Amino acid sequence: MPTISQLVRKPRKAKQVKSKVPALESCPQKRGVCTRVYTTTPKKPNSALRKVARVRLTNGYEVSSYIGGEGHNLQEHSVVLIRGGRVRDLPGVRYHTVRGSLDTAGVKDRKKARSKYGSKRPKSA
């Protein structure tokens, strides 16, 4: 336990908080180009083929980004927008692609939570 005079001489250091999304560099989203679009399998209790894109960002970083929703139109050289947000059962995937922006199409026939998947409002009969 330091004395008050020791604390006056050398104050306590504030703990540095490490960013969970370093590639975004404090931006809400970043643009990038897909270098590889592939499927991968999740961690132990789950089983699926998760859609993932490897993206080279405008700041030079290369990251893995999850493609949410049913079906997508991404391929190599597609320009995408990524946001933060990890996928718990895919190690190393800390970003999500934003659906419905740039080259990424929105999810077709989506009725609920449309804003998260870039779907337009369906025409009411």
UniProtKB/Swiss-Prot annotation:
Disulfide-bond pairs as recorded: none
Position of the signal peptide: none
3-methylthioaspartic acid: residues bearing it: D89
GO CC list: small ribosomal subunit
Region (Disordered): 1-23, 104-125
Keyword Glycoprotein: no
Lineage top rank: taxon: Bacteria
A GO BP annotation: translation
Keywords on record: Methylation, Ribonucleoprotein, Ribosomal protein, RNA-binding, rRNA-binding, tRNA-binding
Residue runs in coiled coils: none
UniProt keyword rRNA-binding, yes or no: yes
GO molecular function annotations of the record: rRNA binding; structural constituent of ribosome; tRNA binding
InterPro entries reported in the protein's UniProt record: NA-bd_OB-fold (IPR012340), Ribosomal_uS12 (IPR006032), Ribosomal_uS12_bac (IPR005679)
One Pfam family from the record: Ribosom_S12_S23
Basic residues biased stretches: 9-18, 109-125
UniProt family annotation: Belongs to the universal ribosomal protein uS12 family.
Subunit and partners: Part of the 30S ribosomal subunit. Contacts proteins S8 and S17. May interact with IF1 in the 30S initiation complex.
Purpose of the protein: With S4 and S5 plays an important role in translational accuracy.
Protein's name according to its UniProt entry: Small ribosomal subunit protein uS12
Lineage: Bacteria, Pseudomonadati, Pseudomonadota, Betaproteobacteria, Nitrosomonadales
Gene for this chain: rpsL
